[in-house]
Amino acid sequence: MRIGAAGAFGWGATLPMSLEQQAMAATTGSGKPGDDVSVIYIFLLGGLSTIDTFDLKPDAPAEVRGEFSPIATNVPGIEVGEHMPFCAQHADKFSLIRSFAHGDSGHGSADKYMLTGHRNSPRPAFGSVASYTHGGRNSVPPYVVLPAMHASAGPQFLGSSAAPFLIDADPSFPGFSVPDLAPPLDINTDRLSNRRGLLATVDRFQRQVETRGKAGAFNKFRERAFSLMTSPEAKKAFDLQSESEQARQAYGNHTLGQSCLLARRLVESGSRYVMINHNNWDTHANNFGDLKTNLLPHLDKALSELLRDLSDRGMLEKTLVVVSGEFGRTPKINKDAGRDHWGPCFTLTMAGGGIQGGRVVGASDEWAAKPADNPIGPKDFAATMFHLQGVDTEKLVYTLEKRPMKLLDGGRVIEELL
């Protein structure tokens, strides 16, 4: 278990400094249209094979079409892979961009493009932009990354106020708790390192607050730090144990399922942007075995339940859900029964937050090798997401060298989805 403000804010910020900067940033985003839209980005690190999930080619040669067959969904004319049966029942809630492309088949550079909307120069991640422009809604962190940090998920020149709150722990583990909530002021961190969990710590601080009745000598920034430790919103958001066993099983008792459940709790409690950084999708070998045994059953259950849960709670209209890897996989199967990296064409899935469900935008060619029409890229995706969140992409921000820069260069809002 790691305790400390540097861990909590992901990029070495001291807690009072981060909160002060966050308070200043929050004033820039009030009153914008879309201010109430949150984002859950399920990032499938390594690259989801969308030719085997959301854009199958049953008429292609065997070395392209692979082992899986398409199945019908609850939307006439839209099919998905046979190992996505639960998602097939919720196709009316999501839309598919089947002509998504950026041409970059390299780890790292493609990740950066998909998470920032910029190909080359270091730029802040989408979640950092949302945190910087809008600030926090309450004491719940506005931008959260789980269950592990990603190198391209940071704030870059926006500074520590826009850094993600990192949950560096697997929410599917027994006794899961959030390790990186730092205690304010002179509270001995050793008292928190005994693995009794976040909730016991919060309960103790709450009893102290009730006894003292006031914050005492805290300045306003340290009061906010104390608030993070004691607020009902934060306690509720991180308390997975309060969910019924039935609810937890509905999402799946695995990393992706419990991460999606925690993400729902976070946006319900006030977070603006939650990135789920999920690994093991780089299927260079045994693509079909890995997909049908673990990867797709987990994704199918977690994603379908997230969409159902958000919809039933009346949250889907105000929660944008995005699913993608940094790229797709090659149309042609390699000698190891795998598919390699493929940036020239893949499928991006979007739901909620103002996105109309049950639509397909664009199309790939007969092998899913390149867009057949209406190519759409990361800048368009970024422009659409920022539009839905009410982020002014013309806003000038300043690098550490005081150089003015727009939050996004180019890109169009994908009106076909709205």
Indicate residue ranges for each PLM-predicted region.
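Ligand-binding pockets and gating/stacking loops
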Residues: 1-418
